[in-house]
Amino acid sequence: MQAGVSEIFSSIQGEGKYVGCRQLFIRLIGCNMDCPYCDTDKLAHSNLVPCVLEKCEGYEGDLELKNPLDLNDIMPYINYRLQQPHHSISITGGEPLLYPQIILELAKNLKPLSIPLFLETNGTLVKQLAQVIDEIDIISMDMKLPSDIGKAYWQEHEEFLKLASKKDVYVKIVVSNESTVEDFEKALSIIKNIDENILLVLQPITPLGGLHEASPEKMLKWQTRAMQVLKNVRVIPQTHKMMNQL
């Protein structure tokens, strides 16, 4: 199966539970959503852009590949980069669960290396998660607030989290000035009803797409409220942007 891959690079995870960990990022093209604050929206719906492989010392293969491509086209580069230590491989996007077969093939190829697979997802494609969950080690699941994106995905999020809770999963909620308390309470209720021990990460929005930054007071108030319901709540911004990392 072919897929659109926009880039592969080694960098620091800047969000969520594993912030600061070194990962090899495989960014897939395509998404089933259109969030206004998306920072990869230019790559979300086009296979016309080439796949760019980060330049690294000693690698002699092509660093720009035509999309869509086969997994065999990028495995030599992935194997070369993994000669250096990495915490895990981040499969990100876009929405990587649009390509469950690619994820399964990747897991099969990487099994001899025993490196964890880290899935970054918008938490809506339940059937696709069911296809790959046995091969995934860590799940970073977004829970989208309707007040920010203009549409509710509560049923999808609930079903997704029930399945994902079998793994090392945490939920990330982007918080803007426009995010409503009603949406937040709904999200808390869903998480609590599945497992109050699931980590919730509140991520202050990096202003984009007409949404505005949440105040420090709002972030503290929302964390306080979440801690009354859940056992583990953290506020973590997009730290990679502070460090000028990809």
Give the ranges of each region predicted by the language model:
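N-terminal pre-triad scaffold of radical SAM enzymes
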Residues: Q2-A44, L48
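Conserved Radical SAM active-site core
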Residues: A3, Y37-E135
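Generic structural signal for well-ordered alpha-helical scaffold segments
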Residues: Q13, M75-N79, K192
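General N-terminal targeting signals
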Residues: C21-F25, C35, D41-L43, E54-K55, ...
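Solvent-exposed, non-transmembrane amphipathic alpha-helical segments
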Residues: F25-I29, S46, C51, K55-G58, ...
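Conserved Rossmann-like nucleotide-binding pocket used by diverse enzymes
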Residues: R27, T92, V201
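Conserved AdoMet/S-adenosylmethionine-binding subsite of the radical SAM
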Residues: P85-S88, L97-L246
